[in-house]
Design a protein with these regions (language model features):
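Conserved, mostly hydrophobic/aromatic
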Residues: 19, 42, 72, 134, ...
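C-terminal helical cap(s) of enzyme catalytic domains, especially alpha/beta-barrels
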Residues: 73-78, 232-241, 333-334
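Active-site loop/helix belt of alpha/beta enzymes
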Residues: 131, 137-239, 243
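Flexible, glycine/charged-enriched surface loops at secondary-structure junctions
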Residues: 36, 192-199, 311, 326-329
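Active-site-proximal beta-alpha core segment in soluble small-molecule metabolic enzymes
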Residues: 40-178
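N-terminal glycine-rich anion-binding loops that anchor highly charged ligand groups
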Residues: 18-51
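Generic N-terminal amphipathic, Lys/Arg-enriched alpha-helix
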Residues: 1-14
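C-terminal accessory subdomain/extension
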Residues: 256-353
Length: 353
């Protein structure tokens, strides 16, 4: 068995004890609130981890792109999949319907009638009904219909099209009070219209902490929580000890007393900054700041640290955004007790179509 200290750097590691505890904790939390767990696999992109989540009690999985569904369907991870992306174009809708014949319970989302029309035509050609959810923008300002009235109007339009079957509403992320108020207005509208809402799907790892404020939710989709990252820690919903993904990187240069350079740049750590002050958190030197990245270098300011690393020292960096790091590498090292227990190919890496 390979020792973790023998791994060449940069190496993306996942501490298995931490990840397994994260999976159990999230499942238990949602079980307590009687909300179904539908984890988002875009974070890990690894079928073996998806199977762990299913074994822990998840009702199904969430995928963001068709390529992810294809990989996870090939691996037999789940019979129940929600694809949370507008699918457009004949090539994609053909792939979608091929998947619909393979995955017993495959549902999609949509937020406009152009998508509904194309999905309907594909479903009609395939002679296979396609369940769908209406995506609702409840404050994130990305995709989604803008009001409960628009949600109802689109649901009526889409339901009138052959091959489409309305199942419910979804959003990302849950925001209080916006999400609650949106659904509190929407659900009576659908009831009066005679359109049963079977599913109300929320999402987001930080939003796990507030699911009790949304009694209408039937399921929750969270991805980052399987690993956690600096962004989640900054939101107050995880601790550094609960961060399973850690990038091992070597100090390759110390040009000044305050400055150190690591061999993990933007091609590993990702340049996602969000509201963070640096590009990752160095566990051994918590006062350090990963000040900036180039492709193969991370420049770290150790000025606030009482101790400074030497050239050749290996450090562990919790990335800002673990989902992107996963898509940067071919394989992830699962470690336990200082040894590499498993090496997982990132099977859905690059499946962005």
């Amino acid at each position: 068995m390979t020792a973790i200290t023998d791994l060449e750097t940069p190496a993306v590691t996942v501490h298995l004890d931490v990840m397994e505890d994260n999976i159990r904790r999230v499942q238990a939390h949602l079980d307590r609130h009687r909300i179904a767990n539908r984890p988002h696999i875009k974070t890990h992109k690894i079928p073996a981890i998806g199977k762990m989540q299913m074994a822990a009690g998840a009702v199904g999985i969430t995928c963001q792109k068709l390529g992810e569904v294809e990989v996870f369907a090939d691996a037999g991870v789940a019979d129940d999949v929600l694809l949370t992306y507008n699918i457009l174009g004949p090539a994609k809708t053909e792939r979608l319907m091929a998947l619909a014949r393979r995955v017993p319970r495959l549902a999609v989302v949509l937020d406009n009638d152009v998508v509904a029309r194309e999905l309907s035509e594909a479903a009609r050609r395939a002679q296979h009904d396609l369940p769908f959810l209406i995506e609702c923008d409840t404050g994130f300002r990305r995709t989604g219909v803008q009001s409960p009235d628009e949600a109802l109007a689109l649901a009526r339009q889409a339901t009138a099209r052959p091959g489409l079957r309305f199942r419910g509403l979804m959003t990302f992320p849950n925001r209080d009070p916006d999400t609650r108020e949106f659904f509190e207005r929407a659900l009576p509208l659908f009831e009066r219209a005679g359109l049963p809402v079977e599913v109300v799907s929320g999402g987001g790892t930080p939003a796990l902490a507030t699911v009790d404020r949304f009694p209408m939710l039937t399921e929750h989709r969270a991805g980052t929580c399987v690993y956690n990252d600096a962004m989640v820690v900054s939101s107050g919903t995880a601790t550094w000890d609960q961060c399973a993904m850690r990038v091992r990187a070597t100090v390759v240069s110390r040009p000044t007393d305050d400055r150190g350079v690591l061999d993990a740049g933007s091609k590993v750590l990702t340049s996602d900054l969000y509201h963070m002050k640096g590009y990752g958190h160095v566990l051994e030197y918590p006062e350090a700041q990963v000040a900036h990245l180039s492709e193969e270098h991370a420049v770290v300011d150790f000025g606030a640290c009482a101790e400074r690393p030497k050239v050749g020292e290996v450090v562990s960096v919790v990335p800002n955004h673990c989902c992107v790091v996963t898509n940067m590498v071919d394989e992830i090292y699962g470690v336990r007790g200082g040894a590499v227990e498993v090496v997982w190919p990132v099977a859905a890496r690059g499946r962005v179509r």
